[in-house]
Amino acid sequence: GEIEQARQTYNVVGNMNEYQVTIGETTFGGRPELADSTGIIDYGSLIYIGLQRSRTAREAIKIMTDLVQQYGYYSEGESFTIADPNEIWIMEMIGKGPGIRGAVWVAVRVPDDCISAHANQSRIHQFDMNDKENCMYSPDVVSFAREKGYFNGVNKDFSFSLAYAPLDFGARRFCEARVWSYFNKFTDNGKDYLPYIEGKTNTPMPLFVKPKHKLSVQDVKDMMRDHYEGTPLDISNDFGAGPYK
């Protein structure tokens, strides 16, 4: 497909532009019936067009959501980390089904003193619809879920994740577990969230947590190499390790 080009674009190298707007992603899939093969914009194009046209994270969110509304969203459910030198946001988005242009989405700002993560599973549950400074969402994010039969409660109880990407045990053990290991490494609350990862409770982990100390670039790089070492999920000590240790 084709879209109209902007009058001005910005330099982009990798996943960052000249204003230090940075966008990362993980795919969570979500309800398969919401995929739309007729949309023009896939998540990768959405990232790079957003970077070409935005000077702040907030501006990137508006540009990205306007694009899918105008041209349609081709990909499955997606989690985006959208950052600039002053703010970090987590945005989650999923289509509306075959032939329906647009998407439902929500974006939540991560507090300056907190850390967050996503690992191929939708992580935004309840969000404050009245906090316009720290939360943005599509106007029909709740009403569309009601229309499809995914949710029938009151607005304050609405969970984007449960409505559009219901968890199963595999999602917890293979996706949410990676977020748990990150939180476990840098907070004292890891033991509180482990029962959720093990499927013993349905209380999800928070979207963000306050770490014990400010993280360095090296801290983040190290966690990208994490294999649950020294935790109950250590893969060298379970059946997945096979005969190797």
Residue spans for each PLM region:
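A contiguous strand-loop segment
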Residues: 1-42, 63-203, 207-210
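Second-shell loop/turn segments in exported
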Residues: 33-37, 45-54
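Generic detector of well-ordered alpha-helical segments enriched in charged/polar residues
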Residues: 48, 65, 142, 221-225
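Long, well-ordered mid-to-C-terminal structural blocks that present hydrophobic/aromatic surfaces
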Residues: 198-245
